[in-house]
From Swiss-Prot:
The gene is psiB. Keywords: Plasmid. It comes from Rhizobium leguminosarum bv. phaseoli. It comes from the Bacteria. Could be involved directly or indirectly in exopolysaccharide synthesis. This is Protein PsiB.
């Protein structure tokens, strides 16, 4: 489950500090609103992804560490002027889940009877939840 927590940015005017905070050398800035920016690692969406985040109004899922900072880059970044609770309302934490599908009791196949309760397949669904605030 993805959690939200406060973090300290050592140098508010340094991209290197933001990169260190989110753990990625290749970062992308996304406008959160007129007064805030999101920073996310570019290479976080990759094969083997076990969780991702949906940001309200943004067309692609986000993965990895995400930093929310006050400012638009024209001045040094600062702490957000909104609460974590307010920010969290714009996110959904998602993870793919595999649900087993079992054969029904009266199922008959071309080659004979299928044992009731035998695993027939797996269905994929996306579990969506609000972030946990720490």
């Amino acid at each position: 489950m993805r959690s939200f927590r406060a973090a300290e940015l050592p140098d508010r005017n340094s991209i290197a500090s933001i990169s260190g905070l989110i753990g990625s050398d290749l970062i992308q800035m996304i406008r959160f609103d007129d007064m805030h920016s999101l920073f996310v690692g570019e290479e976080a969406l990759r094969v083997g992804l076990t969780a991702f985040t949906i940001f309200d109004g943004y067309p692609i899922p986000l993965a990895g560490q995400i930093a929310l900072l006050g400012g638009d880059g024209s001045k040094p970044y600062r702490s957000p002027s909104i609460t974590m609770t307010e920010a969290a309302r714009r996110f959904e934490c998602c993870r793919p889940v595999l649900d087993p599908v079992f054969a029904p009791m009266d199922r008959v196949a071309n080659k004979g009877l299928i044992v009731a309760g035998a695993l027939e397949s797996l269905q994929v669904r996306i579990d969506r939840r609000s972030p946990v605030l720490l």
